[in-house]
């Protein structure tokens, strides 16, 4: 099973709590995180894009770096780990994304890929005067379908004459082209999102579910597997989890309860309000899960709370789910969390037993 890190491009990572570590996003922090992840044989690093935060006492995600420029910098200071940036497709023409991706492919030596997002938080785009209207909620995957076709044209042939409802290319050119086929990823959880991923993505991200219920996402992975069967493509699921680990189960649970007790209710109210704006995409979208009050303090990603052995066991359970090809991990404290994962958790995981130990590497 592949392991990736969801780097904290926004302040405070993924804990909306006054009791969680409070920090600003910087290149130096993310460089240290990704270099440490590479040291411990993580397979990939992904950054999101966020253009407006949730406010509140913690000013949650009010402070964000930009994804492509951050990942270009990280590509230059790493050598093995796969690097993914996120394109907010309403803000960037596909021909520009195609050229930026080809540039980072050159920087990284073929280790770069692109995560495509349609955009769900209306104020992010309205503040710039580029929100296309609420009808977009029901047409966003039509838009993304045209977008990715332009990308594939330009990366594959260096030229596009695509004509659609949203984009018109007139002998559009991009050169040099990427040195290897460019991987495209998506995070579709609605039926429309999964249909898109089944047709165009190399793999699809989905949320884990619940606390210490590592296989609860299995129905989502099964839906993705079924959608991919309809297109005859192999599109696996990569599952988002937060790891909160300590020497014992009780110590880890104490940390988790402490974070929950400090939940930033003002920021969480903003998230809930925004999640209700899209009335056209159905009830199974990512944002609806994010705003669920069950565990909104960490945006309702699957949460693995326990001793190092318990977390290793739960991750092995994730790997046993049909269609689950990888996990995307966040941590309450990224630098210490990745080190602890590499030293204490990963060596206990059966699904990572193929990796050399750090002692073997030094020898």
From Swiss-Prot:
Belongs to the NtaA/SnaA/DszA monooxygenase family. RutA subfamily. The keyword Flavoprotein applies. It comes from Escherichia coli O44:H18 (strain 042 / EAEC). Induction: Up-regulated by the nitrogen regulatory protein C (NtrC also called GlnG) and repressed by RutR. The lineage of its organism: Bacteria, Pseudomonadati, Pseudomonadota, Gammaproteobacteria, Enterobacterales. PANTHER family: ALKANESULFONATE MONOOXYGENASE, ALKANESULFONATE MONOOXYGENASE-RELATED. The keyword NADP applies. InterPro entries: Luciferase-like_dom, Luciferase-like_sf, Pyrimidine_monooxygenase_RutA, SsuD_RutA_monooxygenase. The FMN-N(5)-oxide reacts spontaneously with NADH to produce FMN. Requires the flavin reductase RutF to regenerate FMN in vivo. It catalyses: uracil + FMNH2 + NADH + O2 = (Z)-3-ureidoacrylate + FMN + NAD(+) + H2O + H(+); thymine + FMNH2 + NADH + O2 = (Z)-2-methylureidoacrylate + FMN + NAD(+) + H2O + H(+). FMN binds at residues 49-50, 115, 124, 140-141, 190. It holds the Pfam family Bac_luciferase. GO terms for molecular function: alkanesulfonate monooxygenase activity; uracil oxygenase activity. GO terms for biological process: alkanesulfonate catabolic process; nitrogen utilization; uracil catabolic process. Its EC number is 1.14.99.46. Keywords: Flavoprotein, FMN, Monooxygenase, NADP, Oxidoreductase. This is Pyrimidine monooxygenase RutA.
């Amino acid at each position: 099973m592949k392991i990736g890190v969801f780097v904290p491009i926004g302040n405070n990572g993924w804990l909306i709590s006054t009791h969680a570590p409070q920090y600003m996003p910087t290149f130096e922090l993310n460089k240290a995180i990704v270099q440490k992840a590479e040291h411990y044989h993580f397979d990939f690093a992904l950054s999101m894009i966020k253009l407006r935060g949730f406010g509140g006492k913690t000013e949650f995600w009010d402070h964000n770096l930009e994804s492509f420029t951050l990942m270009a910098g990280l590509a230059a200071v790493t050598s093995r780990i796969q690097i993914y940036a996120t394109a907010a497709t309403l803000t960037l023409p596909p021909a520009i994304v195609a050229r930026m991706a080809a540039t980072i492919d050159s920087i990284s030596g073929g280790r770069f890929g692109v995560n495509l997002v349609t955009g769900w938080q209306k104020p992010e785009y309205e503040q710039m005067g580029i929100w296309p209207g609420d009808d977009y909620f029901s047409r966003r995957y039509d838009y993304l379908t045209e977008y990715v076709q332009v990308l594939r044209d330009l990366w594959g042939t260096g030229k596009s004459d695509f004509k659609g409802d949203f984009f018109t290319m007139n002998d559009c050119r991009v050169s040099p082209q990427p040195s290897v086929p460019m991987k495209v990823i998506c995070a579709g959880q609605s039926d429309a999102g999964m249909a898109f991923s089944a047709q165009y993505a190399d793999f699809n991200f989905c949320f884990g579910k619940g606390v210490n219920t590592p296989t609860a996402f299995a129905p989502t992975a099964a839906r993705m597997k079924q959608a991919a069967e309809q297109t005859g493509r192999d599109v696996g699921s990569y599952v988002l989890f937060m790891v909160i680990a300590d020497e014992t189960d009780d110590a880890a649970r104490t940390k988790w309860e402490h974070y929950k007790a400090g939940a930033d209710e003002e920021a969480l109210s903003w998230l809930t309000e925004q999640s209700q704006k899209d009335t056209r995409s159905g009830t199974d979208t990512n944002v609806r899960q994010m705003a669920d009050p069950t565990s909104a303090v960490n945006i309702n990603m699957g949460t693995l709370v326990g001793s190092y052995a318990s977390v290793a066991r739960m991750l092995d359970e994730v790997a046993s789910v049909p269609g689950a090809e990888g996990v995307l991990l966040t941590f309450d404290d990224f630098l210490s969390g990745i080190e602890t994962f590499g030293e204490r958790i990963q060596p206990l995981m059966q699904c990572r037993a193929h990796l050399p130990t750090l002692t073997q590497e030094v020898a």
